[in-house]
């Protein structure tokens, strides 16, 4: 709840979407390294991502792919549902072919010019978290550009729930990671 943040004035707290945050980070990075030919966008919640994933992503971009995502095949059956009002049951409307589904991870890699163009074209969406892209590859897809998939890694999971944190602590061999 944003109202629980201690602030002196309402102007002390400025909330932006994930997409807008990445766009600002991209601008800052390119001011610092204006001749960068490859940009990686990584989710800090994926703190255990093995270096080999980064190597695969960068290698694919440098090998000619304009956008690259690491991903794993989806193991569970996935259902598409009809959205229902809160408290009402959802109804299944379809079952996608699991063999074509991938769980996407980060870092996602891009030719710099492609990512800049994707954020420029998608900038209106960035102002509203409900409309903002959930990842940068989606912005590139919206440009009609191809997105290449490389092998992800199970260790690149997001640490977002208490269960995830417990798993991360176990993997790191600590009780307080």
Question: Where are the model-predicted features located?
Answer:
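Single conserved hydrophobic/aromatic residue that forms the stacking wall/gate
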Residues: 1-12
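Short acidic donor-binding/metal-coordinating loop in glycosyltransferase active sites
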Residues: 14, 42-45, 106
